[in-house]
Amino acid sequence: MKQLTGAQIRQMFLDFFQEKGHAVEPSASLVPHEDPSLLWINSGVATLKKYFDGRVIPQNPRITNAQKSIRTNDIENVGKTARHHTFFEMLGNFSIGDYFKEEAITWAWEFLTSDKWIGFDKELLSVTIHPEDEEAFTIWNEKMGVPKERIIRLEENFWDIGEGPSGPNTEIFYDRGESYGNDFSDPELYPGGENERYLEVWNLVFSQFNHNPDGSYTPLPKKNIDTGMGLERMTSIVQDVPTNFDTDLFMPMIGATESISGEKYRNGDLEKDMAFKVIADHIRTVTFAVGDGALPSNEGRGYVLRRLLRRAVRYSKKLNINRPFMFELVPVVGEVMKDFYPEVLEKKDFIAKVVKNEEERFHETLHDGESILAEVIAKAKEEKTTVISGVDAFRLYDTYGFPIELTEEYAEEAGMTVDQAGFENEMEKQRERARAARQDVDSMQVQGGVLGEVKVASEFVGYGTVATESNVVALVKNGEYTDSLQAGEEGQLMLDVTPFYAESGGQIADRGYLLADGVKVVVKDVQKAPNGQNLHKVVVEEGTLTKDAAVKAVIDTKNRSSVVKNHTATHLLHQALKDILGTHVNQAGSLVTSERLRFDFSHFGQVQADELEKIERIVNEKIWESIDVAISQKAIEEAKEMGAMALFGEKYGDVVRVVQVGDYSLELCGGCHVDNTASIGIFKIVAESGIGAGTRRIEAVTGKSAYELMNDQVGLLKEAAGKMKTNPKDILTRVDGLFTEVKQLQKENESLAAKLSNIEAGNLTDSVMTVDGVNVLAAKVNVADMNNLRTMMDDLKNKLESAVVVLASVNDDKVNILAGVTKDLISQGYHAGKLVKEVASRCGGGGGGRPDMAQAGGKNPAQVEEALAFVQEYVKSVSK
């Protein structure tokens, strides 16, 4: 067996399958594009669903990839086991209706055993198959020469994740030798069992059935191959190390952590070894996820990242690291992965900044968690229990990121324990929710539909022309082929030549008409068909449209003109954002219509008003410079060398379309654009907002829409100036003057209210009653708000020196209640917080506070007098 690095194994796998006629699919972003069913890309096949379910027909039915993936369903096991990871790479080869079992098995065996490739000893390999898969048994036994005793039949060798493609699978295992297990009385010591000796190398899935909604299985019209080989596990076997963490994919991060901590990995302390592993795993995940646009937050993907970072920081304390340090490991990850993922090093500064910021926040959160825990302990003592509930412990862990181990330590210091069973029960509930979510999202669509069968050519020529003489080459109604569409009927069609742009890259589809003698057809929408043709959604307004009809296809040029202005403006905006906010800005989505443009982008924090102003000015300056827009076809590598931006979620072929705005903007784009920026006219930002963790959105208008917006704003300005009896240019001065007048009136009003309050407070002293030797005052007063109530309360307490006072006011059907107790009475057991809570409850409200002063609110003004009457009862109850 050869000595290989993890990077060499990855490249060798891809090279092997390229030799077998496979197209290499680039590793997709971890953040799923147009697949809301997934939180993360979690397998090699996840990005290929569109091919397997027939929505898109790949140019090459043979595909191979090395796909970065994230799975977080077993975070607690990371570091405890030899092979659990949150981030991993899955190597795979796939066949979409092309080759099947024999080729898949033959090539897998060749890659693993040939001296040209991995070079495993055949005698150390065993395989598992489904008990009824005689075809796989025959191939393994008769063609590959695997002895019967090393072909194990297991019922679980059937891949099925719900509705959609399913089928038997075969797994290949490597025997690592007796040092990893030689107790043959162990019922799990066999290939496919739970043991450390026989490691699964490769899983080959033969998708040959459809799992139907009624639970039945029917043969697929096209049989598929889906295989997966974990790079980390394969590397541990090739490098002959005990765990994945001991490979060159993890050791550089572990080594860097050793340098930071002064501790040593594999020095006899299992707890410290686990800490090293957790840190190495989690920094890989966070680095790649942030690089792909995810940012820490309290929801969704962001919450996963926050949880991973906090778990790593917690484990770092076992290595005596008590400061932010994970950010220092980001460039180490970049160096390890630079051969296949050079973008990590390119983004390392931004990723490190995000990680450091989150670490610093967690160190602050630890203090917050301590405060919450102190309240939990105090509450438990008040309830005379020595056990912190599992629900409270889980809330600290899940909401505040407070480690259960720390909760146990604090509890022990307070002479208490934690309900571990209750905590584990809450954890299991969370796992069940995660498992249910995964089952819901992993199933694929069922194959079918006539559109996937349409192979006729349809050429898009709309970059250079707005009308064509075309022929209807395919006509569909209600999902089935048809020969004609009558007036009033809707359908879908393909043209041999079309000027209509199909929606993609954020740009909406063209609208327009198909015209012929006596026939008028409205084109409402255009989308890409599974085989890449432009598919027109139409409704017949006049006449009858037939298949093979000759028509004139005409787009709505007014609509297209507005769209292209917004599209080119989007490119200018993208570059301006990078100029002002930083190179970390990446497109996270866009919408380009005739009315407006919407641009979503990655950015950590709100865009400030002065930044927006600069961004808007840059875009307008580029418009006013009248820059020519050049469009060319380039080889993908040449385009990247030129510095062209490749956009989020887009797939590119060997030859790409490059859109260049002078020397300012350079992007790969298949959309429609103006010839010169001057055509855009003007650019105006309408709104900026946050739409999720680390993602911002800018909405803007150009051209006529921008003119109309500014006209409306000028009109509003003139109207406001008229009402203020001033000129538009003097309106700010007038507004400042009005603010000054309002502030002066507020001061006068407050002064008058204070005087009235003092007068009313003076009159109230005549209403003081003595209850069991205690001065008691409970009154409804006429004041504007709680602040005036407090002023009156302070005045009364000073005048009365010793008293229990409750004041209530009603404004706009809202009840304000304030209770006060002088210091001498607090020591006798009187408590303003408890009193105000009781009073408020009697008029539909609630509240509380300190022993000397407390406030509350109520909802039923009619019950205020009755509520105040309770004050005497309260005083009597305390004085007993």
Swiss-Prot record:
Q: Which InterPro entries match?
A: aa-tRNA-synth_II/BPL/LPL, Ala-tRNA-lgiase_IIc, Ala-tRNA-ligase_IIc_anticod-bd, Ala-tRNA-synth_IIc_core, Ala-tRNA-synth_IIc_N, Ala-tRNA_ligase, Ala_tRNA_ligase_euk/bac, DHHA1_dom
Which UniProt key words apply to this protein?
A: Aminoacyl-tRNA synthetase, ATP-binding, Cytoplasm, Ligase, Metal-binding, Nucleotide-binding, Protein biosynthesis, RNA-binding, tRNA-binding, Zinc
Principal localisation: cytoplasm
State the free-text cofactor note: Binds 1 zinc ion per subunit.
Q: Which SUPFAM superfamilies match?
A: Class II aaRS and biotin synthetases, Putative anticodon-binding domain of alanyl-tRNA synthetase (AlaRS), ThrRS/AlaRS common domain, Translation proteins
The record's EC number reads 6.1.1.7
GO MF annotations in UniProt: alanine-tRNA ligase activity; aminoacyl-tRNA deacylase activity; ATP binding; catalytic activity, acting on a protein; transferase activity; tRNA binding; zinc ion binding
Q: Where in the cell is it found?
A: Cytoplasm
Q: What class of enzyme is it?
A: ligase
- Cellular component terms (Gene Ontology): cytosol
Report the domain remarks: Consists of three domains; the N-terminal catalytic domain, the editing domain and the C-terminal C-Ala domain. The editing domain removes incorrectly charged amino acids, while the C-Ala domain, along with tRNA(Ala), serves as a bridge to cooperatively bring together the editing and aminoacylation centers thus stimulating deacylation of misacylated tRNAs.
What protein name does the entry list? Alanine--tRNA ligase
Recorded source organism is: Bacillus mycoides (strain KBAB4) (Bacillus weihenstephanensis)
Instruction: Recite the lineage of the species.
Output: Bacteria, Bacillati, Bacillota, Bacilli, Bacillales
- UniProt lists the gene as alaS
